[in-house]
Amino acid sequence: MPLSRLSIQWKITLLTGLCLLCIVSLLVGLSLLRMNHDAQLIKAANADMLKDAAKARMQARSEQQAEIIQRFFTDVYLFGNQFSRQVAQLREQTTRHGVDAASVRKDLNQLVRDGLKSNPNLLSLYVVFQPDALDGQDASFHDQADAGSNEKGRFGAYWAQKASGEMTGLAVTEEMIADTSAMLDGSPFNTWQLCPLQTRKACVLNPYFDSASGTKVLMTTVTLPLIDQGKVIAVIGIDISLSRLQQLAVDGDRQLYDGAGSVSIVSPAGLLAGYS
């Protein structure tokens, strides 16, 4: 039926229906658009929540691993601190009680050896006094390595041990003490002595290579000053193989998403000390 022949009532009804259809279509379209927008917001919010949860877990695990590594170095420091007290007590036998200097030096040398033997995880242990700071009798002990004394008589007992348990000892020479050749981080080799002497605090050296134990090993050193009457009279050093830190990194990686990630242990100078 032609539109012109429709009554005014039908025309109004059709026009109203078309308007309602357009409105409904518009509302449905807006609703679908809003639903899609809300879905995107929910998806983004969930992704952020999952990301934040993963970051929080990673942070907690990294702090846990950092505590394990810190505990490792703390144990070394505590051992060194206790050992330094034993060294101080032996020194007092000469300075206060008049015990024979030769006996004290041999006892100190044996103390270093025994201290290392009781800690199989350590590579080496040493005590190096300042000139004449032990007993004022360095001149009487030139080249007496069995008494822990070097070519000038300075006491500098050094003991190293291999994985087999074999132990070797030597007297730290003046050349070793004065060695300023650059290590991996550019610092002088004798930083082991300079750092505690200058800072009067315990020091942890950046990773470096050393072959004093018979094989070339990547290692680090914890050194402590022995202080008497406000002066540093000796340096105590503890050498640690970085294979131990490497194992800590591997263990940490296994506990983090079943080894799907990686763990790096980096020194303050940016040198890699352990990686998995």
What are these regions, as identified by a protein language model?
Residues L116-K201, P207-G214, L272-S276:
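Extracellular/periplasmic ligand-sensing ectodomains of membrane signal-transduction proteins
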Residues K55, Q70, G186-N190, D239, ...:
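Amphipathic alpha-helical bundle/coiled-coil segments
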Residues M1-R5:
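Short, Lys/Arg-rich, polar N-terminal cytosolic tail immediately upstream
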Residues T215-T220, Y257-A260:
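Short, small/polar residue-rich loop motifs at catalytic or cofactor-binding pockets
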Residues D107-G115, V235, D239-S276:
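Solvent-exposed, extracytoplasmic
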Residues I8-L14, C19-L111, K117-L123, A202, ...:
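Juxtamembrane extracytoplasmic/periplasmic/luminal helical "stalk" adjacent to the first N-terminal
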